[in-house]
Amino acid sequence: MANTNPIVDNKETLQYVIDKGRTTPINVYSAAAVSKGFKGEELTDFTELKNGGALVFTDDGIPLKSEMLVKEAMQKAKELDMPLSFHEENPAYIEQQGINKGVVSDKLNIGGAPACSEYMMVARDCMLALETKATICIQHISSAVSVELVRTAKKLGADVHAESTPQHFSLTE
């Protein structure tokens, strides 16, 4: 993923990662950032990064709040036949990351992250993918509503994929 230090948001850092990878006994492939510095304000140079060896664009771990930036990223990625991968959660609705907003978080008085913080972003990006015809992957999906949104977007013709991890679907209340 692009969430390295430094962030893979330019050709020099990408080349550094690729060169370091060549010194290992395994194949190392790299993602590149969607936005410069993971700030969600300005796109990286997708063409330069693709030509440099990036295989996907993502601001992994950081949600992209700007709908216009996401749409622009999808349009550019579609032009280059490159996938995008999104971390879907709206920070405005999250009181405490890492715990579901529900009975347990309320009992412990620690806030939490409601499912709507995820599925509202999933809905937005699925519909933008449908409109732009971009290929997107929803990272570590965790709510049934999000799964249904992806399923619906796919039925409508969007090129949307999703992944999850055991802790995102098995640790429930």
Q: What are these model-derived regions, one by one?
A:
Residues 1-22:
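Metal-associated gating/positioning segment near the N- to mid-region
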Residues 17-23, 46-51:
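Acidic (Asp/Glu)-rich catalytic clusters
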